[in-house]
């Protein structure tokens, strides 16, 4: 238990924020007990993994519970590998664990920061692959009554960086473990960036893993050097008519057709076209290598990051008439606040 302690080491933006209390839990019963104790005392409660997708705007006037649930189990049948990983396991370490056992499938999701329990919330994705493709179940606890239950993939209502855990199960519930189902008949996903150079007939999952790690390491800043939360904005999805108008004005715009007929745009490219790389407000800046990443360049505050995000959204809106939506969760004094509203 840590009283009135800095949250700086508990989130990757490394902003100067404190919490009344920080408790690392290693069992589900401890999580339930501490959550109920804080709730009875009318204390706000925030459950964190590695804090890789949060922005603290102020000191948190409540209790922060840090997920340290550990353990990975594996079984298999003729066609599939089944993995159950506890919510506090590091996601990238899990990807490495699967590859060490010659289990392919997760290699495109290498080096995504955070813990396993956060993966379903965001439906994390990268390089043409999303978490939902491998989700077998998500194990959840109702913190109010201690009931533990599983949701299958359909019940998770996955969308682009979205799930039921951002809505119906946002409050009073916690993800304690995740079940993955990985086919033994592996098909590589090579339709993104430099992965297209590989042949589907000869490439190995380890080669894809190494390439993805190299790409991410070259483009994304190390949080220990410059605090950040990875991609700050989602890639916007627009209808085909709107896209046609934008493409007429900007023929070179990169785009990704979606199965439903809509078009996904590259948020980083849009920001870059607004000449915002390196743009700075206080200690917060747009990263010079990857415009989609906002960084804590020099002792930034949460409010400075918000101001920077506001400017980015406004410039992109003005130039392209496209709305960027924050991917990062904004945490105020007593809990999550509306990132859309605060950066409008």
Swiss-Prot record:
Its EC number is 1.3.1.98. Pathway: Cell wall biogenesis; peptidoglycan biosynthesis. Keywords: Cell cycle, Cell division, Cell shape, Cell wall biogenesis/degradation, Cytoplasm, FAD, Flavoprotein, NADP, Oxidoreductase, Peptidoglycan synthesis. GO terms for biological process: cell division; cell wall organization; peptidoglycan biosynthetic process; regulation of cell shape. SUPFAM superfamilies: FAD-binding/transporter-associated domain-like, Uridine diphospho-N-Acetylenolpyruvylglucosamine reductase, MurB, C-terminal domain. The keyword Ribosomal protein does not apply. InterPro entries: FAD-bd_PCMH, FAD-bd_PCMH-like_sf, FAD-bd_PCMH_sub1, FAD-bd_PCMH_sub2, MurB, MurB_C, MurB_C_sf, Oxid_FAD_bind_N. Pfam families: FAD_binding_4, MurB_C. It catalyses: UDP-N-acetyl-alpha-D-muramate + NADP(+) = UDP-N-acetyl-3-O-(1-carboxyvinyl)-alpha-D-glucosamine + NADPH + H(+). Its main location: cytoplasm. One of its GO terms (cellular component) is cytosol. The keyword NADP applies. Residues 15-185 form the FAD-binding PCMH-type domain. GO terms for molecular function: FAD binding; UDP-N-acetylmuramate dehydrogenase activity. Its cofactor is FAD. It is found in: Cytoplasm. Cell wall formation. Belongs to the MurB family. This is UDP-N-acetylenolpyruvoylglucosamine reductase. It comes from Haemophilus ducreyi (strain 35000HP / ATCC 700724). The lineage of its organism: Bacteria, Pseudomonadati, Pseudomonadota, Gammaproteobacteria, Pasteurellales. The gene is murB.
């Amino acid at each position: 238990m840590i009283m009135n302690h800095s949250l700086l080491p508990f989130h990757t933006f490394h902003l100067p924020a404190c919490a009344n209390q920080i408790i690392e839990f290693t069992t589900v019963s401890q999580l339930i007990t501490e959550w109920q104790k804080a709730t009875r005392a009318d204390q706000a409660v925030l459950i964190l993994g590695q804090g890789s997708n949060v922005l603290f705007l102020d000191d948190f006037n409540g209790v922060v519970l840090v997920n340290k649930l550990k353990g990975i189990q594996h079984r298999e049948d003729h066609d599939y590998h089944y993995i159950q990983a506890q919510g506090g396991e590091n996601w990238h370490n899990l990807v490495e664990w699967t590859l060490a056992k010659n289990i392919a499938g997760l290699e495109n999701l290498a080096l995504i920061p955070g813990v396993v329990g956060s993966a379903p919330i965001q439906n994390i994705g990268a390089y043409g692959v999303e978490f939902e493709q491998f989700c077998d179940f998500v194990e959840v606890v109702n913190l109010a009554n201690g009931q533990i239950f599983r949701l299958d993939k359909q019940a998770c209502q996955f969308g682009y960086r979205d799930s039921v855990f951002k809505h119906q199960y946002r409050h009073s519930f916690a993800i304690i473990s995740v079940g993955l189902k990985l086919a033994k008949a592996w098909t590589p996903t090579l339709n993104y960036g430099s992965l297209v150079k590989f042949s589907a007939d000869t490439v190995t999952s380890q080669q894809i893993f190494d390439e993805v790690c190299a790409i991410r390491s070259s483009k994304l800043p190390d949080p220990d050097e410059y605090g950040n939360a990875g991609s700050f904005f989602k890639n916007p999805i627009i209808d085909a008519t709107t896209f046609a108008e934008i493409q007429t004005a900007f023929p070179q715009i990169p785009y990704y057709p979606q199965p439903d007929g809509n078009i996904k745009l590259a948020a980083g490219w849009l920001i870059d076209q607004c000449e915002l790389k390196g743009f700075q407000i206080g200690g917060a800046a747009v990263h010079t290598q990857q415009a989609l990443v906002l960084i804590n360049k020099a002792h930034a505050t949460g409010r400075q990051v918000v101001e920077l995000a506001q400017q980015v959204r406004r410039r992109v809106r003005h130039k392209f008439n496209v709305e960027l939506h924050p991917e990062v969760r904004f945490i105020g004094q007593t809990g999550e606040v509306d990132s859309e509203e605060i950066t409008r």
